[in-house]
């Protein structure tokens, strides 16, 4: 009887409550983040202690809207969840990690509470390539009749034929035009000239290689023969203020350049009235206006391509920035300079014979920055791209990037090239290049070299030149109608 009483007096064992589970301290990105881009996302969770997520539990981690959980990993106090198969559709996705999935390492410890993490993807409309449908008029409402004639002709030829073109070797001669004729029996439809030697015009007697821009016999000859005239401007500026001070009296300073690594000239200062840099560019613009006026007086329209290649290399080749001083300090000053140049030449100096061509760089990846640098539809008539590549492909990537830039509102052209894009390939691809302009090369004696050894040019063999010039998809000077009326 006593033993029975003793057994009934025993106390039940004590059951301890589990210790609180791991607590979530932070989440990256934060819960509720919007504008997520890409097809994958890594969510990083930080807890207040070391945690684990056994393989058997990882299958319980889910995400909705068709996305998938690719991987879950726990290490020390951090858990990462890799989410895949996301779409930039504007939808909100929710990641769920049920209670019991993540736990600590202590005995008699509860698991972490359920975690719900939501994020919203950026809405990106599906890419639809733009079709070329250029506007029917020039940006200058007072454009000369001859300029209108040229533009209307380019519109008519778009998608039918590409005009042949070459850049002269000495900036103001027809030597390359004549060399192509001598070799193929046809003259290029478009001849390119350059205000490269502006600071040395008129030509000093002892500098035979410098051009006299008052002598417009070369463009007059080209226009009179039915060809078109293109001018660009490798805009030389003083290397330093000292060079400007030393040369300002005779305007023939020795220290000049257009490459960024050769001049400290600052476009931002040039846009400020009252600075010596502004004084310089305004004098240059005035001088160029005078030379263009000579052409307008002769009824010669000018396909005008200043500030070419916009930003140069768009920093895609490294930290050195743009090639040319007009792109060194970013998009905004460059756009301002373009608009200033347009305003001065058109509105101040009253030049109505210009067709404005804005040029981009061909570098892959630069397409995403074109719009940042574009001065606006109201300042540009035609879009160009300078292409130096080791093939004769149709250049579809570059073509579509230009067309997309203005949703097809502007004609597009290969404004410079080495190896000529094959006209047949271009037509087969539906690439409606308005013209191509082959850059000039010459030997040490100044003779034109049609097939340089450089890989970007050497496919322009003797036979290929003849093939291109005789192509049914190419228009040469001999094929041009009279546009001088």
Could you describe each region identified by the protein language model?
Residues 123-196, 200-212, 424-425, 479-485:
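N-terminal module-boundary/linker segments of secreted carbohydrate-active enzymes
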Residues 39-72, 100-103:
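Short, surface-exposed alpha-helix to beta-strand junction/turn motifs within ectodomains of secreted
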Residues 13-33, 99-126:
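Acidic, Ser/Thr/Gly/Pro-rich low-complexity segments and short DxT(G/T)-type signature motifs
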Residues 4-7:
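C-terminal motif of bacterial Sec signal peptides marking the signal peptidase cleavage site
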Residues 193, 370-392, 439:
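Aromatic- and acid-rich polysaccharide-binding/catalytic face
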Residues 201, 205-342, 347, 351:
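Substrate-binding cleft of extracellular glycoside hydrolase catalytic domains
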Residues 163-168, 410-485:
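Substrate-binding cleft of secreted/luminal carbohydrate-active enzymes
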């Amino acid at each position: 009887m006593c033993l029975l009483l003793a057994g009934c007096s025993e106390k039940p064992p004590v059951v301890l409550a589990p210790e609180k589970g791991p607590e979530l301290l932070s989440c990256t990105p934060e819960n509720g983040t919007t504008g997520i881009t890409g097809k994958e996302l890594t969510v990083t969770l930080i807890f207040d202690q070391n945690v684990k997520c056994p393989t058997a539990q990882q299958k319980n981690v889910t995400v909705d809207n068709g996305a998938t959980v690719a991987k879950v990993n726990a290490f020390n106090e951090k858990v990462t969840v890799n989410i895949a198969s996301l779409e930039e559709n504007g939808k909100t996705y929710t990641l769920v990690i049920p209670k019991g999935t993540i736990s600590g390492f202590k005995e008699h410890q509860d698991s972490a509470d359920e975690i719900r993490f939501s994020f919203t993807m950026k809405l990106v409309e599906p890419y639809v390539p733009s079709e070329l449908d250029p506007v029917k008029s020039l940006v200058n409402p007072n454009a000369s009749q001859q300029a209108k004639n040229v533009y209307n002709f380019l519109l008519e030829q778009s998608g039918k034929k590409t005009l042949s073109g070459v850049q002269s070797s000495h900036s103001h001669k027809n030597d390359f035009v004549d060399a192509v004729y001598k070799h193929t029996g046809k003259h290029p439809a478009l001849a390119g000239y350059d205000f490269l030697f502006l600071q040395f015009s008129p030509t000093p007697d002892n500098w035979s290689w410098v051009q006299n821009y008052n002598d417009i016999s070369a463009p007059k000859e080209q226009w009179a023969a039915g060809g078109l005239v293109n001018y660009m401007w490798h805009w030389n500026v003083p290397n330093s203020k000292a060079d400007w001070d030393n040369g300002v009296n005779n305007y023939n300073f020795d220290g000049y350049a257009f490459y960024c690594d050769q001049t400290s000239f600052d476009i931002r200062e040039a846009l400020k009235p009252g600075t010596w840099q502004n004084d310089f560019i305004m004098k240059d613009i005035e001088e160029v206006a005078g030379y263009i006026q000579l052409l307008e007086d002769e009824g010669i329209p000018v396909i005008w391509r200043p500030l070419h290649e916009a930003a140069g290399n768009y920093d895609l080749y490294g930290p050195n920035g743009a090639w040319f001083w007009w792109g060194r300090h970013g998009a905004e000053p460059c756009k301002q300079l373009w608009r200033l140049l347009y305003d001065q030449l058109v509105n101040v100096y009253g030049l109505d014979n210009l067709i404005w061509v804005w040029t981009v760089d061909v570098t892959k990846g630069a397409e995403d920055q074109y719009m940042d640098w574009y001065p606006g539809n109201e300042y540009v008539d035609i879009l160009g791209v300078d292409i130096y590549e080791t093939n004769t492909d149709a250049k579809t990537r570059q073509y579509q990037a230009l067309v997309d830039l203005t949703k097809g509102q502007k004609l597009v052209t290969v404004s410079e090239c080495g190896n000529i894009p094959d006209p047949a390939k271009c037509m087969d691809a539906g690439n409606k290049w308005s013209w191509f302009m082959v850059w000039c090369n010459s030997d040490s004696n100044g003779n034109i070299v049609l097939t340089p050894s450089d890989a970007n040019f050497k496919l322009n063999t003797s036979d290929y030149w003849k093939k291109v010039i005789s192509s049914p998809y190419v228009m040469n000077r001999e094929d041009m109608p009279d546009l001088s009326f």
